[in-house]
Amino acid sequence: MKSSNLYSKLLNAPKNAPVFLSQNLEADFIVKAYTFGLFPWTSKPVTWWCPDPRCILIPNQIHIQKNMKKFINLYQIKLDYDFLKLITLCRDTRSQSWIDDEFITTYYKLFTQGYAHSLELYENNELIGGIYGLILGKVFFGESMVSIKKNASKVAMIKLCDLLKPYDFIIDCQVYNQHLEFMGAHNISRKEFLNILKEKCNQESGFKNFKDLIT
């Protein structure tokens, strides 16, 4: 299907329901799907979503509450250090999760290909939280966050925004929740989001290696 045809179909797709189903997750298809605002949410079958409205966060609009400041430098930050351990932690800390073995294997492949990335938080060399997602152009497509210690996921988002501020990124948060709104995220229409992706996904990120953003 031509890109223009897919774009038109997505504009008229269900707002709060799967756009289509697939039997498997394939790394190459995931990369293409993300550039059209699609993401997988459940497995067997895989459900693909493109919600309207869409929740995004502009890094320089992050809200940092006063009570968070004491946590910001409490944890050690590592980038792309142990992606597999982080995504597994995201699965294991949820009683019900769409992150199954196939999902982990596929996203780890995307990590080895340089598309998927992780920001990990450590305390005394123990992984206690973080966030992972895909970077395509100047968009960080957030997939999941995890927090074992107090406010670890919030610190991860604050640190991610701090790192991406100089590069004119947007962060795709997928679906609105109060936790994200509290941090400065907001909803935009699907049409506006897809137009942003047309521009941002075709730009250079501005850095060579994500992991080198922390020196």
From Swiss-Prot:
A Pfam cross-reference name: Leu_Phe_trans
Keywords: Acyltransferase, Cytoplasm, Transferase
Entry GO terms, CC: cytoplasm
SUPFAM superfamilies: Acyl-CoA N-acyltransferases (Nat)
Top enzyme class: transferase
GO molecular function: leucyl-tRNA--protein transferase activity
E.C. number(s) listed in UniProt: 2.3.2.6
Coiled coil: none
Reactions the enzyme catalyzes: N-terminal L-lysyl-[protein] + L-leucyl-tRNA(Leu) = N-terminal L-leucyl-L-lysyl-[protein] + tRNA(Leu) + H(+); N-terminal L-arginyl-[protein] + L-leucyl-tRNA(Leu) = N-terminal L-leucyl-L-arginyl-[protein] + tRNA(Leu) + H(+); L-phenylalanyl-tRNA(Phe) + an N-terminal L-alpha-aminoacyl-[protein] = an N-terminal L-phenylalanyl-L-alpha-aminoacyl-[protein] + tRNA(Phe)
Subcellular location: Cytoplasm
Protein's UniProt keywords contain Metal-binding: no
InterPro entries: Acyl_CoA_acyltransferase (IPR016181), Leu/Phe-tRNA_Trfase (IPR004616), Leu/Phe-tRNA_Trfase_C (IPR042203), Leu/Phe-tRNA_Trfase_N (IPR042221)
Alphabetical GO biological process terms: protein catabolic process
UniProt similarity note: Belongs to the L/F-transferase family.
Biological role: Functions in the N-end rule pathway of protein degradation where it conjugates Leu, Phe and, less efficiently, Met from aminoacyl-tRNAs to the N-termini of proteins containing an N-terminal arginine or lysine.
Official protein name in the record: Leucyl/phenylalanyl-tRNA--protein transferase
Source organism of this protein record: Campylobacter jejuni subsp. jejuni serotype O:2 (strain ATCC 700819 / NCTC 11168)
Source species taxonomy: Bacteria, Pseudomonadati, Campylobacterota, Epsilonproteobacteria, Campylobacterales
Gene this chain is encoded by: aat
